[in-house]
């Protein structure tokens, strides 16, 4: 398995995985919109995507968005999306993607990474804790959905 940094030319490898990821969170299937969304993020340099590959087959991806910690005066990365194809689960793909994201944060001089996950997504929580992530017990999260 190889972890590569995705480029716009890789969009057709990522789109089916991204569509499946969205379906996991109960969004309707829409491969073309998924493809367009990923293409825009990559061509506009709005996100960084790492792709797990094996024999020209995409196994999973992690997508990071840049943010800033104002008080710390440093950058950080939002690990917004992590998905592994069902046929490739329990083979270390998710862990390899998490490690590559962490390595990238180090390479960019970032303060760190953060993520959020569904409270009932126990497999993901187990993976994050295995990779050394700590659940925040200090801060509340607030959302205001506009549309």
Language-model segments: which ranges?
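Conserved acetyl-CoA-binding loop-helix of GNAT-fold acetyltransferases
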Residues: 84, 90-103, 130
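A short helix-loop-beta-strand connector motif used in the catalytic cores of GNAT acetyltransferases and
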Residues: 39-51, 78
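Conserved GNAT-fold acetyl-CoA-binding loop/helix
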Residues: 15-40
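Conserved acetyl-CoA binding element of GNAT-fold acetyltransferases
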Residues: 75-86
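Conserved active-site alpha-helix within GNAT-family acetyltransferase domains
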Residues: 95, 119-137
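A short beta-loop-alpha structural element at the N-terminal edge
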Residues: 2-16
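Conserved GNAT acetyl-CoA-binding A-motif
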Residues: 98, 106-116
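Conserved beta-strand in the GNAT
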Residues: 51, 57-66
């Amino acid at each position: 398995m190889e972890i590569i940094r995705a480029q716009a030319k890789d969009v057709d490898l990522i789109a089916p995985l991204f569509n499946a990821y969205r379906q996991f969170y109960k969004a309707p299937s829409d491969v073309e919109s998924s493809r367009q969304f990923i293409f825009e993020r990559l061509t506009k340099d709005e996100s960084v995507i790492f792709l797990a590959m094996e024999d020209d087959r995409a196994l999973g991806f992690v997508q990071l968005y840049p943010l800033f910690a104002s008080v710390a005066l440093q950058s950080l990365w939002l690990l917004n999306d992590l998905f592994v194809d069902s046929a490739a689960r329990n083979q270390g793909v998710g862990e390899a993607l998490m490690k590559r994201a962490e390595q990238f944060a180090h390479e960019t001089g970032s303060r760190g990474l953060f993520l959020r996950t569904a409270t009932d997504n126990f497999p993901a929580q187990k993976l994050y804790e295995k990779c050394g992530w700590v659940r925040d017990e200090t801060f509340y999260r607030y959302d205001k959905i506009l549309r």
